[in-house]
Amino acid sequence: MFSGSIVALVTPLDTDGEVDYNSLKSLVDYHIKAGTNGIVAVGTTGESATLSVEEHVKLVMKTLEFADGRIPVIAGTGANATHEAVTFSKLFHDSGVAGCLSVTPYYNKPTQEGLFQHYKAISEATDIPQILYNVPGRTAVDLLPETVARLAELDNIVALKDATGDLDRVAITRELCGENFIQLSGDDATALDFVKLGGHGVISVTSNIAAKDMATMFALAAQGKFEEAEIINQRLMPLHNDLFVEANPIPVKWAAHRLGMITHSDIRLPLTELSLSAQPTVEQALKSAGLLK
């Protein structure tokens, strides 16, 4: 259902801070041409935290429109209030989204039982396939493998995006949830190793600007050609790392603009554009990856 290289798509903005739908269409077409296996619209990289509900819904629907059935679209639907996460998921009922990506509730630090009840409520409210999203570095809460296993028993909770960077969890989660439960890395730098250990793919920041390389790398991995995949991975490693020299998605939006993929690198406050001191680092990473001369 979900595998390979799935992009956590940036949300292009104009200089007035409004969504640039022309650039969005270009990005969708770019990923289809490059062989990307799926698009996450309005996740963390898509600046979900600073979009209004109306913008959020329109962005997902426009992404679906531009995709036109040519690539699966996953809607970001996470919130730190359960009723809001439920509402977001229900808004996309019959929309054509392939699934919903729902981050753990952030800031309010629920217990494991609270996390279970949160996702259970979402599961009961919709039949859209749900992807759990664990990123404790941003949310201050860790969805433990034992809780994932409880949730995996619910019919439409089908996958986990694991952005912990803890590769030991791949085998633990596989043992607890079974091999059919989909595990997706949320950490580009360790994603290939994640797949070597039994994961199914990645939801990627790097893929925003190196989509063909990422798609090829994970296609090779799926064929067991890990040595060939590792050659690509090592070339992209500076990008995997330096796209986080400042908070995501600041560097990747700057890089996408530098490559002419989006019209502007604007980002909504409280995030600010990539600092002058960090720009040479990202520029060099683009050159190391072969994306700039």
Swiss-Prot record:
Keywords: Amino-acid biosynthesis, Cytoplasm, Diaminopimelate biosynthesis, Lyase, Lysine biosynthesis, Schiff base. The record marks T44, Y107 as: Part of a proton relay during catalysis. Its main location: cytoplasm. The active site is at Y133 (proton donor/acceptor), K161 (schiff-base intermediate with substrate). It comes from the Bacteria. It catalyses: L-aspartate 4-semialdehyde + pyruvate = (2S,4S)-4-hydroxy-2,3,4,5-tetrahydrodipicolinate + H2O + H(+). SUPFAM superfamilies: Aldolase (SSF51569). One of its GO terms (biological process) is lysine biosynthetic process via diaminopimelate. It is an enzyme of class 4 (lyase). SMART domains: DHDPS. Pathway: Amino-acid biosynthesis; L-lysine biosynthesis via DAP pathway; (S)-tetrahydrodipicolinate from L-aspartate: step 3/4. InterPro entries: Aldolase_TIM, DapA, DapA-like, Schiff_base-form_aldolases_AS, Schiff_base-form_aldolases_CS. It holds the Pfam family DHDPS. The keyword Lyase applies. Belongs to the DapA family. HAMAP family: DapA. Catalyzes the condensation of (S)-aspartate-beta-semialdehyde [(S)-ASA] and pyruvate to 4-hydroxy-tetrahydrodipicolinate (HTPA). Homotetramer; dimer of dimers. This is 4-hydroxy-tetrahydrodipicolinate synthase. It comes from Aliivibrio fischeri (strain ATCC 700601 / ES114). The lineage of its organism: Bacteria, Pseudomonadati, Pseudomonadota, Gammaproteobacteria, Vibrionales. The gene is dapA.
